[in-house]
Structures are given as C-alpha cells and as structure tokens.
C-alpha cells in the first residue's frame, strides 16, 4: 500500500476536519479568501512595484490637490506643468497597475490551488486508499438488516461503517450546521405581494 495504515479514528477525525474546512471555504467563498490572501501579500511583500505604485499614487494625489488649488487662468504655466505631471503619473500608474494585476492573478491561482489541495485532494486520496477500511462497528440488531447493509456500502460487511457513509453523514451535519449559523445573517427576503386584478 502506498499510504500508511492509519487507525480508523485517525481517518474519522482527518476526514471530519477536511470536510469542515471545505464547508468553511464554501460558506466564506473562494473570492473572499483570495482577496484576504492578496491583502496579506500586500502587507508582507517587499515587492518594489507595489511600493512604487503606492508612492506614485500619493504623488498623483498631491499633484491633483495642487492643481485644484490654483486657477488655470491666473497661473496657466504652473497649472499646465502640474497637468503634464499628473498625466505622466497616471500613465505610469496604469502600467504599474497592469503589473500588479498580473501578480494578483498569480497569487489568486496559487491560493486557489492551495485550497484545492487542502480540501479536495485528501478526500480523493482517502476514497481511493481507505475505501475498504472499517471506521467503526454498529452493534448487531440496532438497525434492520437493510439499514446495516446500506451503512456498510460500498465494500464492507454488514455492521461496519465505512468512509463513504461517514463522509455523507459529516457533510449533511456540517452543511446543516453551516446553514443554521449563516441563516440569521442572510439577506432578508421581502414578503411577496399578490397581484390584484383590476376590473
């Protein structure tokens, strides 16, 4: 076997944590997580183009403030010089913005790949390598035979519970819990109004 022979409770707990993480990602949203990762990258990065962009943006703001403070008719030469400087800064900012957007795109791809590796890959690995592992047993006679048979699907003897049923149960519980927690914060839906017929 390629993977180590894990204790059933280790598999139970690992799959539970992965499914909770997957539900958290679904509830929060990948785009929100990617935006958070990008903001963290902006804070900790020593990337020169980001620093240059911020300084040029501040410089453009100052130039525009000075330009608004003077009259174009009274001080035409100074206003024209400031206007040219603002146009030059805007062009530089646009170029830097394109570079930063490319960096953001690569950071988004990397964070998306990390989310995929952390939430989907472990589930597929477990499904392939631990599908025949008995996670726990149910006392005989608690459920009818057909329920025991369903719980043992797809590869286990009656009375055993495997990974497929465990994942189904955990997904159901976690998604229902997530709904109960997020429901009070959901956008309120207005009460429908009946169309009245005009005679």
UniProtKB/Swiss-Prot annotation:
Q: Which GO terms describe its molecular function?
A: protein-membrane adaptor activity
Classification via Gene3D superfamilies = Helix hairpin bin (1.10.287.660)
Q: How does it sit in the membrane?
A: Multi-pass membrane protein
Origin organism of this chain? Candida albicans (strain SC5314 / ATCC MYA-2876) (Yeast)
Q: Could you tell me where this protein is found in the cell? A: Endoplasmic reticulum membrane; Golgi apparatus membrane
How is this protein organized at the quaternary level? Answer: Component of the Golgi to ER traffic (GET) complex, which is composed of GET1, GET2 and GET3. Within the complex, GET1 and GET2 form a heterotetramer which is stabilized by phosphatidylinositol binding and which binds to the GET3 homodimer.
Cytoplasmic-side stretches of the chain, per the record, are 32-115, 178-199
Protein task: Required for the post-translational delivery of tail-anchored (TA) proteins to the endoplasmic reticulum. Together with GET2, acts as a membrane receptor for soluble GET3, which recognizes and selectively binds the transmembrane domain of TA proteins in the cytosol. The GET complex cooperates with the HDEL receptor ERD2 to mediate the ATP-dependent retrieval of resident ER proteins that contain a C-terminal H-D-E-L retention signal from the Golgi to the ER.
Which residue stretches, if any, does this entry annotate as coiled coil?
Answer: 76-116
The Gene Ontology CC terms held by the record are: endoplasmic reticulum membrane; GET complex; Golgi membrane
User: What name has this protein been given in UniProt?
Assistant: Golgi to ER traffic protein 1
The biological process GO terms on file are:
tail-anchored membrane protein insertion into ER membrane; vesicle-mediated transport
